[in-house]
């Protein structure tokens, strides 16, 4: 009766699969790290100021407008941005860029703001 021990462990056949699993996990980790660092700021060493990366590349995952106003004269508005309801926010948001560069949130339910939005969309600059 000859008992020969198998000198090759049975786990050798599973090593390529294990290596693939490790590589997959590492690639997922690197992908997650790379995407999380894109939104961080970088330091401008020449000026000593922080400047943020281009914010147009990233979508906000929450409502942009916390406080709204309806008391704005249409002649002060340079442009309007209307953001519809979505998964990020359950209300319509109207963001006005003023001629001095500031951005303010307008109340989309106010009759005056509705009229301003309609006139701006129609291309009429004389909305009252």
Swiss-Prot record:
Pfam families: IL8. The keyword RNA-binding does not apply. GO terms for cellular component: extracellular region; extracellular space; platelet alpha granule lumen; tertiary granule lumen. The keyword Secreted applies. One of its GO terms (biological process) is positive regulation of cell division. It is found in: Secreted. Keywords: Antibiotic, Antimicrobial, Chemotaxis, Cleavage on pair of basic residues, Cytokine, Disulfide bond, Growth factor, Mitogen, Secreted, Signal. Residues 1-34 form the signal peptide. Proteolytic removal of residues 1-9 produces the active peptide connective tissue-activating peptide III (CTAP-III) (low-affinity platelet factor IV (LA-PF4)). InterPro entries: Chemokine_b/g/d, Chemokine_CXC, Chemokine_CXC_CS, Chemokine_IL8-like_dom, CXC_Chemokine_domain, Interleukin_8-like_sf. GO terms for molecular function: chemokine activity; CXCR chemokine receptor binding; D-glucose transmembrane transporter activity; growth factor activity. Disulfide bonds join 63-89, 65-105. Its main location: secreted. Belongs to the intercrine alpha (chemokine CxC) family. LA-PF4 stimulates DNA synthesis, mitosis, glycolysis, intracellular cAMP accumulation, prostaglandin E2 secretion, and synthesis of hyaluronic acid and sulfated glycosaminoglycan. It also stimulates the formation and secretion of plasminogen activator by human synovial cells. NAP-2 is a ligand for CXCR1 and CXCR2, and NAP-2, NAP-2(73), NAP-2(74), NAP-2(1-66), and most potent NAP-2(1-63) are chemoattractants and activators for neutrophils. TC-1 and TC-2 are antibacterial proteins, in vitro released from activated platelet alpha-granules. PANTHER family: PLATELET BASIC PROTEIN (PTHR12015:SF198), SMALL INDUCIBLE CYTOKINE A (PTHR12015). Beta-thromboglobulin is a homotetramer. This is Platelet basic protein. It comes from Homo sapiens (Human). The lineage of its organism: Eukaryota, Metazoa, Chordata, Craniata, Vertebrata. The gene is PPBP.
């Amino acid at each position: 009766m000859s008992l020969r021990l198998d000198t090759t462990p049975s786990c050798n056949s599973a090593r390529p699969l294990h290596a693939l699993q490790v590589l997959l996990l590492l690639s997922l980790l690197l992908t997650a790290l790379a995407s999380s660092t894109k939104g961080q700021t970088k330091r401008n060493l020449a000026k000593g100021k922080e400047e943020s990366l281009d914010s147009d590349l990233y979508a906000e995952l929450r409502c942009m407008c916390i406080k709204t106003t309806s008391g704005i004269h249409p002649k002060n508005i340079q442009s309007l941005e209307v953001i519809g309801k979505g998964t990020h926010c359950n209300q319509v948001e109207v963001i006005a860029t003023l001629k001095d560069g500031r951005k303010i949130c307008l109340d989309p339910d106010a009759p005056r703001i509705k009229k301003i939005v309609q006139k701006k969309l129609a291309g009429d600059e004389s909305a009252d």
